[in-house]
């Protein structure tokens, strides 16, 4: 109880130091988090049989590697170091990997067995091996059939100088030189498997004298590395399918970095690669920056010509890739060359270019951050991955994000203590909560309807208010007119003096009343005027 199953992925995580050491031997760097992500989430989606817990099956690893190295938008350059390291663990397994390595059956032997004559009985019992490269020479006659056809384009190399670093080996003791066999140098160090162009296939010497071994590029016996030069089609495709170094140094640098990691080129191959992909001025600039990156024993850039020439020579050096020392020189040379490409690709400092990088309407925060970092690398002398530059990159990320994301990031609590990773995570949350175009359209339509409804209600309210105010004014006016007429009547009555009971109201004399007043004219009485009333219709 309590036991957990061990998987290839968990095994690599438990021995992460060994994984990093293997990656360093391949001139690459790996990170644990991305290692887990690619193994458990990315590679299973390639539909090549990769399990979520990882595998050391070389066939499945090869299928994943083909997907990763696919040209164009279907490739995954960022996953190259990880699949290369995983392949190295499967090809040259450490002790803790060997129990998980799938034995590789001799698939090449059965198809060619019917065409071979019957083999003589062996004097010793046959021994089984996990690695076909370590099988007995008597059982490996059909191996030369795996190599490319001798009638291929390699025939043109007969007229050229021999390729670099060929180790012809010492002459045989009996003085008989055989072009098909090369005697191994005694005491030569055991070579470790490498990828692609320097393939560490261990092929036994071929005893069949009818198989041509005149080409040094096909030398594969006795643990020697096989050498394949760049094909003209590869160089042509790389040059025509990628922008120039001056136009987009980042993209071309990524291509050359991928080639350096996967093909493990020699010094001559590097010169051929630079001469094809770069102009003369660009190549000189790259070489100059690479020589500036050479470090001395104290770890600082050195100015000593001897140290610089030893680490990054301008003329063809005497480095043998069949020896550990020669391979170490080549690994260091490729690292310096990559540093020279990165430094030469930086444009003059132009902070305006960096400030001009803004987040697109539908661009994710992670993609925007990558563009922002690339602008820092290209237009400034600062490294965005440097912890000392994290504050500047964070501020640029906030200010140049989309308006809705930037406003919410500025209102975060304890903003000064937030790391760049924290800001990216918060921005991702805000970005993922954005409404879809359909939701946005529905919201705009709903807001428009609500606005129209509010406008109509406001118009009705104002109309009612105007009517109420008009009625109130008319009522006041009517009340004023009626009140004035009433006051006129009452005022006339109040102006009449008080009369005695025997006093005339007309002449004010006593002794008679107004109807009997002799001074009052006796004519027909006119009609009494009527008070006129105003109505609302008037």
Curated annotation (Swiss-Prot):
Annotated motif LYPX(n)L motif, positions: 130-134
MF terms (GO), sorted A to Z: RNA binding; structural constituent of virion; zinc ion binding
Domain of life: Viruses
Pro residues bias: start-end ranges: 111-124, 161-173
Interaction with host UBE2I: annotated segments: 430-435
Transferase recorded as keyword: no
Region annotation (Disordered) ranges: 111-218, 434-538
Protein name: Gag polyprotein
Taxonomic lineage of the native organism: Viruses, Riboviria, Pararnavirae, Artverviricota, Revtraviricetes
Gene for this chain: gag
